Amino acid sequence: MFDDPSKRLTYFEYAVGVLLCSWPVMKQAVEEEWADVDTADKRDWMAGVLVDYITVTSDVEAWDVEELILQVLQDEFNVGSIEDDSPYILAQDLVNVWKAACEDNYEPIREIHERLGKQLLEKEEGKEKTREESNPPVLVEDETIVDAEDGGAAQNQQEKQQGPIVDDDGFTVVQKRRR
């Protein structure tokens, strides 16, 4: 794993994603939804921005990457400032991993995978399994999937019995389907 030079960019994208997901500031931002409800999507977008910037810029420096990180945090995550050096340390790690990958040295990416990537993958698999076990889907008469906790089958029967709703002017009211 991590030894095919033709997949250099893919390996680097993976390493950036793992480092960004493991960065305590970003973990807190996602948990507390600093960027509204789509914070995880913005984190993933940020990873793409960092990959694009680092791979396109010749002689990229950690200071420049740190500035980009801070700018994105300010614009997208509403972060005024960060009190520690962690953005610079993250930027340094990203630049070092890219420079090593450009020399076909994938050892830093392997280390990131062993140290952080496996834990993230196991955590995600655990979350998926927990979600599936706690809320199994139930098939109802009209073959729509409804959550068991929802009481969706009883609600579906009520809607069928009610029929269309007509307003005072004689128009049929279109209602949004409840999930």
From Swiss-Prot:
InterPro entries reported for this sequence: Pre-rRNA_process_TSR2
Acidic residues compositional bias, start-end: 140-150
GO biological process, alphabetically ordered: maturation of SSU-rRNA from tricistronic rRNA transcript (SSU-rRNA, 5.8S rRNA, LSU-rRNA)
Localization: Cytoplasm; Nucleus
Basic and acidic residues biased stretches: 123-134
Cellular component terms per the entry's GO annotation: cytosol; nucleus
Matches recorded under PANTHER family: PRE-RRNA-PROCESSING PROTEIN TSR2 HOMOLOG
Protein name: Pre-rRNA-processing protein tsr2
Gene: tsr2
